[in-house]
A protein has these predicted regions:
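Primarily interfacial, aromatic-capped hydrophobic alpha-helices that serve as membrane anchors
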Residues: 245-306
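Alpha-helical transmembrane segments that form the membrane-embedded catalytic/substrate-binding core
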Residues: 176-180, 211-214, 218-245
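Functional transmembrane or membrane-interface alpha-helices that line membrane-embedded catalytic
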Residues: 193-202, 231, 236-260
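Charged/polar, low-hydrophobicity segments characteristic of intrinsically disordered regions
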Residues: 136-142, 217-231, 270-275
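Non-catalytic, membrane-anchoring transmembrane segments at the edges
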Residues: 6-12, 16-17, 45-46, 233, ...
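Hydrophobic alpha-helical bundle signature of multipass membrane enzymes
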Residues: 7-167, 176-214
Length: 306
């Protein structure tokens, strides 16, 4: 009884400490301290890092440095021309990694280290799988879009220096933020957080995911064609957790509340993403592998030989 009382007291204290705080304000420390030193989390971490290094960075730089010859699909759309280039939004774009690391950190602070570890391991396994699955497309057909000159914006200079910009479809930025919202919403529900907490944190992650998804277009790192492919991928990787209806709801939230484009242009963007998402669904319904309709579309696009 004493142990049970102490456990409940610690649980209540953790909840009290986080009361009123947003996930974006809790920092990023604990994942860096915990994940590398526990076998349960180290194994998926190593798989994730290996995939990022080999199947994301090295895959692109081999082409950039002339070590590999390939065809690169040009996946831009005329709709992209109506979306302004906003380098000042690069902070949001670059926050993509901390977006999920903060969610891991919050999970540790809210649940305690012991209870959080399986969830940390689960997320690292899931994000590693997302990168691995996207790389199956990248290895067959790379894709790119035109990028404007970055000027004096330091963030954009860093982005252009570190990202050769050859792996646009599907967008991992979009896939991972969708994964983050879906995964941690399920964790909060599974661990019995109050309804008020669940709504607060799930809403925060949803809005953050939408904001980052919009930003990939504002900083010209992706095309409107990259987003539906990512959402289609996640409906397969997350199965019943991220449904077709969830993807539709996500699209419906894009470019709704913004002063940077007109309401009419926002509607045009959403309609196109809906169209492409529906097309992938219809073409993929009789396929055994989700990458088939994505590759079919990529193979139909004009290419640059490098």
């Amino acid at each position: 009884m004493k142990d049970s009382a102490e456990f409940q007291e610690k649980k209540d204290l953790r909840k009290k400490r986080l009361q009123g705080k947003a996930i974006k304000n809790v920092g990023i420390l604990w994942p860096y301290l915990l994940i590398p030193i526990h076998l349960i989390t180290l194994k998926p971490l190593l798989f994730y890092l290996k995939t990022v290094i080999i199947d994301f960075f090295l895959l692109q730089f081999k082409v950039k440095w002339g070590w590999k010859k390939t065809s690169i699909a040009q996946v831009t759309d005329v709709i992209d021309e109506g979306i302004p280039f906003l380098p000042e939004k690069s902070d949001i774009y670059l926050d993509f990694i901390n977006f999920w690391i903060r969610s891991l950190n919050f999970t540790v602070l809210r649940l305690g280290r012991k209870k959080a570890l399986p969830h940390l391991a689960g997320f690292m396994a899931a994000i590693g799988t997302a990168y691995h699955e996207a790389a199956r497309v990248y290895k067959i057909r790379m894709s790119t879009t035109p990028r404007p000159a970055v000027g004096k914006n330091k963030n954009m200079q860093t982005i252009h220096r570190l990202d050769p910009h050859l792996l646009c479809v599907p967008s991992l930025h979009v896939g991972v933020v969708v994964l983050t919202h879906t995964f941690f919403t399920a964790v909060f529900r599974q661990e019995g957080l109050s309804q008020e907490e669940q709504e607060q944190y799930s809403t925060e992650l949803w809005e953050g995911a939408v904001e980052i998804a919009e930003t990939v277009l504002y900083v010209k790192q992706h095309s409107v064609n990259c987003i539906p492919a990512a959402l289609y991928m996640m409906t397969h990787l997350l199965k019943d957790q991220f449904t077709i209806q969830d993807a539709i709801n996500f699209i419906d939230c894009l470019f709704v509340d913004t002063s940077h484009i007109s309401a009419e242009q926002g509607k045009v963007i959403r309609n196109h993403i809906h169209y492409m998402f529906d097309r992938l669904l219809l073409e993929g319904c009789n396929e055994d592998d989700w990458i088939v309709p994505v590759l079919r579309w990529l193979m139909s696009q004009p290419v640059t030989e490098v």
